[in-house]
Amino acid sequence: FPVSLRYSIVSKTKGFRQGALPGEDYVEVGRDREESIKAAKFLQKAGYDMLNCDNGTYDAWYWSHPPIYMPENCNLEDVEFIKGYVQIPVVAAGRMTLDKAAQSIEDGKIDGVGFARSFLADPQWLTKVMEDREEEIRPCILCHNACFNMAHYKGVPNDQDLQDSLHLARCAVNAEMMQ
């Protein structure tokens, strides 16, 4: 079986329980690009087949799953950077636009792109893209109100009972996903 890892290139963390926001001036206290190069090479040598890349940490989760206020393609520059240091496929995740993703793949800067919430909003998303029917796509509104209910479960962050794990595939704009 292929082995992949959701790999955070830069932690985007300015202190304990303090994630950094886009454009904010801060000193990185977590993994930076230099450490990321070493870690990515180590993972490749250890036998990983692919790195599914984003940014962020537990304290800066919004880089991994960008909400509406995050810039489009917010992780792409760092993902393109790490691609230059490994020979295994590198996939970018995090509020990617189709045009920018396609261009980056065509230019050989990344090997693929991960789209997840788009499929919750519209399970026919890829078919509509391939058939040039993008105007018919029901877009993800990046609200985190349904797909990330576990981020603040019963008033406690990240404390969802595993018994409820079957109810995580939800989407505020797709009633068929509501369970």
Regions found by a protein language model. Give the residues of each.
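Flavin-dependent oxidoreductase catalytic cores
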Residues: 1-179
